[in-house]
Amino acid sequence: MDSVERIQKGEEYIGVALGSEHGVDPISNTTAYHLVSSAEECIVIVLHNHPSLSDFSLSDVQFLLRYASVKMMVVVTNLGNISYLVKGKGYAYEKAVALFNEAVSSNNEAQDLKGLQKAADHFLKNCCMVGIDYDNR
């Protein structure tokens, strides 16, 4: 049975997409793409490091918002910190996109790495207002 059949039957299945030195695209692998695009619900775990040692970047958040099937995103940093973003029962897509756009505007005005992190932090500090739970351990 191939991956598409297993996904369609709702069986548990894992797709792995490897990144490069400068980025990671969780759906760059065919199997991972099929999982995200055809599953009713899925969890994406991203293992990567950001230069600032931050957890979620705006690119990570954009991925979470883009795919309705992704209900949880987990980031494990190079220092072993684990952070979660979970779409809760009160998740409001339109409000989440508006909050994301606020963060992107701040990001576009950033002059340095600290400014870029501040933009991502803006989303993370306010995401509970749009039904997304954030936890960092």
Regions found by a protein language model. Name each.
Residues 1-16, 73-76:
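Short beta-strand scaffold segments in enzyme catalytic cores
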Residues 2, 28, 36-38, 52, ...:
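Serine/threonine-rich low-complexity intrinsically disordered regions
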Residues 10-29, 83-89, 98:
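Short amphipathic beta-strand/extended segments with alternating polar/hydrophobic composition
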Residues 18-69:
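Short HxH-centered metal-ligating active-site micro-motif
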Residues 69-137:
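Divalent-metal-activated hydrolytic enzyme cores
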